[in-house]
Curated annotation (Swiss-Prot):
Organism: Clostridium acetobutylicum (strain ATCC 824 / DSM 792 / JCM 1419 / IAM 19013 / LMG 5710 / NBRC 13948 / NRRL B-527 / VKM B-1787 / 2291 / W)
Cofactors required: Mg(2+)
Family of this protein: Belongs to the enolase family.
Taxon lineage: Bacteria, Bacillati, Bacillota, Clostridia, Eubacteriales
Alphabetized UniProt keyword annotations: Cytoplasm, Glycolysis, Lyase, Magnesium, Metal-binding, Secreted
The protein's name in its UniProt record: Enolase
Catalysed conversion reaction: (2R)-2-phosphoglycerate = phosphoenolpyruvate + H2O
Pathway where it operates: Carbohydrate degradation; glycolysis; pyruvate from D-glyceraldehyde 3-phosphate: step 4/5
GO-annotated molecular function: magnesium ion binding; phosphopyruvate hydratase activity
PANTHER family recorded: ENOLASE (PTHR11902:SF1)
Length: 431
């Protein structure tokens, strides 16, 4: 097997994501004709510190959302530099793109252009070797199947309803295996749908496959999910746990948390107490973006108050960025990071963020975006780094289900070696 395999072509095209918005797809071709292909997701609630997703802003095309400039950046600028390079030099390839871009936030080439190339390179390398992507990225030690964090009720930016918190999720941490975890989630999802129908509530699905019923409060969303869990034959707090993503930056105004759906405005201290009370009352195991991305003091209060018993995930807070994560670790803020490839824009930087988190005793939760494609890289990535948790939507809508189906294939391929850690995936909290 050759150790230097030349990249002979790099090409990008514009395709559509799951929200009918254009996104970037890249193909990397090797000297023997092997092709690696990857496409890039896009978020709805984006943190201000995320790497730049380059869009054309040409109102005559896709309402300004086209990505032809990013495509050109791949086909003209990046391709020229990468052709002739060794496909196995992932770090050098990513470094080369960072140097060509030269900006702090990837605003010249676009994180969407760079990520498409970065992932397609890794895919091409795995294809050439005839191994799965998770094996290529993680080696023989890649064996942990993740606990799903499934978004089944939506509010906030992901829905047109009275619920302020953006996502209410279930986590089947009591399941014995990934496939059983997936089954239990699907059963709860169907049961929830019937339950909503019986109450005369809306069952149309949102961007990530979750339901967006018009409930009276955030607490009602938790209650209705727990009712569905019990009805489906599972025990809350033993088989199935609740995870929430309030996405609080979205309702943080002038230093206060403005919950419009509930008609309440809270200080950081009061908001922490709202969460502490919910955690006391319900089997909540994970809370993402409980405080706003710039409310470091609020985050510290939250971590000190409930950080020993609940996973506190930084998404907008950390944006998969080692500089921001490093600050969080030093301040003792949060105990987990959400990993979104397109927040940072290269595979190398993503792996660095995961490694930094794990070394500090933080968990890493690998995540989709609300605008997705059929690309399943995150399924391989989560197993490659043994992260133990994945957030990739409801068990509905093919761009979500594709990720779960890929994990079923990986579980099957690993066979006896496959591990499902369940509650032990939460090594950052006391159980």
């Amino acid at each position: 097997m050759k150790s230097y395999v030349e990249i002979v072509d790099v090409m990008a095209r514009q395709i559509l994501d799951s929200r009918a918005n254009p996104t970037v797809e890249v193909e990397v071709v090797l000297e023997d004709g092997t092709v690696g292909r990857a496409s890039v997701p896009s978020g709805a609630s984006t943190g201000q510190f995320e790497a730049v997703e380059l869009r054309d802003n040409d109102k005559a095309q896709y309402l300004g959302k086209s990505v032809l400039n990013a495509v050109d950046n791949v086909n003209e600028t990046i391709a020229t530099e990468l052709i002739g390079m060794n496909v196995f030099d992932q770090t050098l390839i990513d470094q080369t793109m960072l140097e060509i871009d030269g900006t702090e936030n990837k605003s010249k080439l676009g994180a969407n252009a760079m990520l498409g190339v970065s992932l397609a390179v890794a895919r091409a390398a795995a294809e050439y070797l005839g191994i799965s992507l998770y094996q290529y990225l993680g080696g023989v030690n890649a064996k942990v199947l993740p606990v799903p964090m499934m978004n089944i009720v939506n509010g906030g930016k992901h829905a047109d309803n009275n619920v302020d918190f953006q996502e209410f999720m279930i986590m089947p941490a009591g399941a014995p295996s990934f496939s059983e975890a997936l089954r239990s989630c699907a059963e709860v999802y169907h049961t929830l749908k019937s339950l909503l129908q019986s109450k005369g509530l809306e069952t149309a699905v949102g961007d990530e496959g979750g339901f967006a019923p018009n409930l009276n409060s955030n607490e009602e969303a938790i209650q209705i999910i727990l009712e569905a869990v019990t009805k489906a034959g599972y025990e809350p707090g033993k088989d199935m746990f609740i995870a929430m993503d309030p996405a609080s930056t979205e309702f943080y105004e002038n230093g206060k948390y403005n919950l419009k759906g509930e008609g309440k405005v809270y200080t950081s201290e009061e908001m922490v107490e709202v969460y502490a009370n919910l955690v006391e009352k319900y089997p909540i195991i994970s809370l993402e973006d409980g405080m706003a991305e710039e409310d470091w003091d609020g985050w510290k209060l939250l971590t000190d108050r409930i950080g020993d018993k609940v996973q506190l995930v930084g998404d907008d807070l950390f944006v998969t960025n080692t500089k921001r994560l490093s600050k969080g670790i030093q301040l003792g803020v949060a105990n987990s990071i959400l990993i979104k490839l397109n927040q940072i824009g290269t595979l190398t930087e993503t792996l660095n963020a995961i490694e930094m988190a794990q070394r500090a005793g933080y968990t890493a939760v690998v995540s989709h975006r609300s605008g997705e494609t059929e690309d399943t890289t995150i399924s391989d990535l989560v197993v490659a780094v043994n992260a133990g948790q994945i957030k990739t939507g409801a068990p509905a809508r093919t761009e979500r289900v594709a990720k779960y189906n890929q994990l079923l294939r990986i579980e099957e391929e690993l066979g006896e070696v496959a591990e499902f850690r369940g509650l032990n995936a939460f090594y950052n909290i006391k159980k």
